[in-house]
Amino acid sequence: MICSDKVHEILYGGDYNPEQWGEEERQKDMQYLPEAGVNIVTLNVFNWGMLQPDEEHYDFSELDETVQMVTDKGMKICMATATAAHPAWMAHRYPDILRTEFSGMKRKYGARHNSCPNSDTFHKYATRLAAKLAERYQNQDNIVAWHIGNEYGGICYCENCEKAFRIWLQKKYGSIEKLNQVWNTHFWGHTFYDWDEIVAPNLLTEHFENNRSMYPCITLDYYRFQSDSMLQNFIDESAEIRKIIPDAKITTNLMGFYKELDYGKWAKYMDFVSWDNYPNAGEPEAMIAMKHDLMRGLKPGMPFSLMEQTPSVSNWHNYATLKRPGEMRLMSYQAMAHGADTIMFFQMRQCKAECEKLHSAFISHVGTNNTRIYKECQALGKELQSLGSEIPGSLVHAKAAILFDWNNWWAI
């Protein structure tokens, strides 16, 4: 839950990317979204390249227009820091920012989740952008939450990470002798005499398959280290925002049973837990329920936010199945029944092009409010409005619990 005196109702809305569209479409959005009961939009998730054209210059003019546009319609804002995908110029000039895959392949610019979490370049510019956003919008009263990054993930195996891994190990074990003892390095002659001899465990070193390590002790510590590295990115951006907005409510969107990150540890640094629910077609309802319960349990005594779900089709599943009439409503209420008091979607208007152009939205490529999906979203929005202020912040005390631990998961 966004514990804020600015929030007194169930928040309903989702990701909005008007920079992909022209003025005519934006004006229609500002009619259709409020009519659907939308009272919050997430802005600026992937705008880093638009906001920062080079090392020293920033351009917030288009974001300013969007903020004003949704504010005029009475909507609240979840403001993202845009650091989920670095700009092309940054990768070109500072290749240390590029992530290395498990195979040892060094990435070039492209896609997203392509930043090394231990790159000095990434840290410098990401924290600077977070600070500039906080400074610019600190007095924007309808910003009720700040969204760091997006769906953190993507383990890196580059030289930046190897160097940082050695420092992390020194802090954990204190001496190389202690590390040798804990890692049982007498096995297969792995005794280390210098920290610089330690390398990242991947297909080039200790693995013969993705989940099959010949030295599980090394791999387990590397998982811990990478989770901590990405968490530090989150913490550092959060700190820049809090310097300017001490009472900011800060989160990032988690992904259920996502193995790469220790969400139990992450949740301690999040003001409220939010997550993205994208079940596969035919996924058992009990598994979806368990994911909701996992998210609810990360911060005991608090509801969580459903940050993303799809109104109908997910573009990236093996089978792009339409949700049946009423299914989106059912899944939204399932989330609420398990502790959500924020129901949000990806996204408000369907992408103009590229890989998510077939991912559904409130407003489809037809561009009108006369579609089944829009009408279902509108009906749900009206229902949520009728619930008033009774549900946000409410709790149900569980009589049973399931223990789930990422370290055990990694070790299996």
Q: Each PLM stretch: what is its role?
A:
Residues 11-23, 44-63, 108-127, 149-156, ...:
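The substrate-binding groove and active-site-proximal loops of carbohydrate-active enzymes
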Residues 27-107, 131-134, 234-244:
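Aromatic-lined substrate-binding rim segments of carbohydrate-active enzymes
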Residues 1-40:
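An acidic-aromatic substrate-binding cleft motif
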Residues 14, 33, 41, 70, ...:
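Conserved, mostly hydrophobic/aromatic
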Residues 20-35, 126-133, 253-266, 324-332:
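Short, acidic/polar
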